[in-house]
Design a protein with these regions (language model features):
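Transmembrane alpha-helix boundary signature
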Residues: 72-75, 103-116
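Helix-boundary and loop/linker segments of multi-pass membrane transporters
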Residues: 5-13, 44, 81-85, 116-124, ...
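Small-polar-interrupted transmembrane alpha-helices in polytopic inner-membrane proteins
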Residues: 158-174, 189-192
Length: 197
């Protein structure tokens, strides 16, 4: 990205970061409310189908809100923030083989339990699980490594642009903790920051 494409003031940079974060939350919230309302009237044959539709809705709505603010609010392009539909072959390979590897490890150290799901239900559950991961991964990467990182880099420097989004990434995951302990929160912040870097 050419840094001369935009040069926001400190306050404008912080406001833009806040707006993108709120759009990130709004995409998920509005999608959840819409699908919960819709499916309170329409019954689906499977909970996994609900998850599939909700994750697709959240992904598309969040991406649309990001695009709308970027192009109409800031009069910039998505590629100005490093966001392009360019998919690398090695990325696809890693995204397929890493879950297979992790599943194999769990299968070796865990115990098998027989479930009563049909083949169709198992397929829906697998697709739902993949969409949960894709939705989270894509929208979080757009927010933290796209918008926030590029805004901070444009205003300050690459070190701040790497550290702050990584730290914010870890803070966003605190509410997903099952139990709150000081050591648990500190471990999440440290590991989330390291993963983000």
């Amino acid at each position: 990205m050419n840094q001369t494409q935009y040069n926001f003031s400190t306050s404008k940079t912080l406001v833009n970061i806040l707006v993108y974060f709120l759009l990130f939350l709004a995409g998920d919230l509005f999608s959840s409310i819409s699908f919960d309302l819709l499916f309170s009237f329409v019954e689906l044959p499977s909970n996994a189908l609900y998850v599939i539709l909700r994750m697709l809705g959240a992904l598309l709505l969040t991406a649309f809100l990001f695009w709308l603010y970027t192009t109409k609010g800031l009069h910039l392009k998505m590629k100005d923030f490093g966001i392009t539909p360019n998919i690398k072959k090695w990325g696809v390979l890693i995204s397929v083989f890493l879950p297979v590897f992790v599943t194999a490890i769990f299968a070796m150290i865990g115990k098998f339990e027989v479930n009563s799901f049909s083949a169709g239900e198992i397929c829906l559950i697998i697709i739902a699980s993949m969409l949960i991961a894709l939705k989270s991964g894509i929208t979080e990467e757009m927010l933290f490594r796209g918008y926030i990182m590029k805004l901070l880099e444009s205003r300050w420097n690459k070190y701040i642009a790497i550290l702050i989004p990584s730290f914010l990434f870890s803070l966003v995951h605190i509410p997903s903790m099952e139990t709150f302990t000081v050591s648990g929160v500190l471990l999440l912040i440290i590991s989330g920051t390291v993963v983000g870097i």
